[in-house]
Amino acid sequence: MPSPDSMTFEDIIVDFTQEEWALLDTSQRKLFQDVMLENISHLVSIGKQLCKSVVLSQLEQVEKLSTQRISLLQGREVGIKHQEIPFIQHIYQKGTSTISTMRSHTQEDPFLCNDLGEDFTQHIALTQNVITYMRTKHFVSKKFGKIFSDWLSFNQHKEIHTKCKSYGSHLFDYAFIQNSALRPHSVTHTREITLECRVCGKTFSKNSNLRRHEMIHTGEKPHGCHLCGKAFTHCSDLRKHERTHTGEKPYGCHLCGKAFSKSSNLRRHEMIHTREKAQICHLCGKAFTHCSDLRKHERTHLGDKPYGCLLCGKAFSKCSYLRQHERTHNGEKPYECHLCGKAFSHCSHLRQHERSHNGEKPHGCHLCGKAFTESSVLKRHERIHTGEKPYECHVCGKAFTESSDLRRHERTHTGEKPYECHLCGKAFNHSSVLRRHERTHTGEKPYECNICGKAFNRSYNFRLHRRVHTGEKPYVCPLCGKAFSKFFNLRQHERTHTKKAMNM
């Protein structure tokens, strides 16, 4: 290996064939360019005399091999001209002499790089200044507001747009900028591409973001579900919706394996494992993992119902409740069972129905082991063990385990019966009672036993019937331990103990 004193530029240069160059990725080509410039800079700094033709050939190699074949150093007009780049023009107008001719110049007649405004007495210094200039300049496409740190990246950007025939060379009105001027100049470009909404004045940096925002004003929903026809503003919302049809749950908990259709639901679920329940209700002390859940819960205490129906005026504490209610007006049932074709107005009702086909009961009580098809039913059941009744009537003080029971009870005070049968006009205080009544007109019996085929118009009667097959007797007498399949039968039995006690 040559010593540093005897080392020449020819000793350290690397030549690539076109085939070898094609095997390099963008980062490797950039690394080669940087190392090559470092080598030139180092040899110049230790006073080495460099041959102009070798240095310029090496500087040109990256461009030759990049398929654009733009020679900035020999003056060929392939894609771009020297006069378009002022500092290159000045350097090569002044630097065409041979090295021997350069040495014949006196101190009073140096080479002058007009663009840089500095005098050089040696071609080596001029070459070093070219390298420094290339390093401290940025290449800018004024049309697109893009800034590039090297000439190769700028040319790659230019090539992308020149492939499109609708763009002319006027798009590449570029300039060189000093590092010190980069920040204010880039701000100028940012201002040029600021996009403003004509309706509300909100500004955006990308045209795609502006178009998406404008759909809020226009109500445009270009992304439609091919299964139920429901439309959405954003394609991401459509993808989430499609999972309600397919049942896809791509977000799985790495601790328990439970899967979710939304990443936000997974994050909320993960808090159950970490027991992060920092959101505490100051009225009842109940804790929540998410502040939005706390706000929803607080509305049960305050009676706050900010979401009102435009058709009937009925108000709800949650936006999802309002959307579900609106379907009672328009009859929309977007969620269809792929096994029997039955349609539902809410996805939770569909999931609950599907479990009637497969018998799945994923939600188990940790106290008694009883399992349920819905988590809400499990929570309702757990209150039997705890005795919790969080929903209290502000008129009479009676408390209930469920908010729906409280609402139904409040109608006994107000006399409100908002659910009316469109066939006979009879009104009811609860939607479930209306649905049960409508079956007397239609003869519908949606609850069918999968063992004997008997059908029922009420879920309660269906549950009682199943106990005939299963032998289940959930109602146990605390005095003698005798069990019954119906609560009514337990009450009758308990009276026998009362009579015995009275006769003694």
Curated annotation (Swiss-Prot):
Coiled-coil segments on the chain, per record: none
Principal place of residence: nucleus
Keywords in alphabetical order: DNA-binding, Metal-binding, Nucleus, Repeat, Transcription, Transcription regulation, Zinc, Zinc-finger
Single GO biological process annotation from the record: regulation of transcription by RNA polymerase II
Superkingdom per UniProt: Eukaryota
Protein name: Zinc finger protein 596
Record InterPro entries: KRAB, KRAB_dom_sf, Zinc_finger, Znf_C2H2_sf, Znf_C2H2_type
Keyword Nucleus: yes
CDD domains, per database record: KRAB_A-box
Parts of the chain that traverse the membrane: none
Gene source species: Homo sapiens (Human)
Family: Belongs to the krueppel C2H2-type zinc-finger protein family.
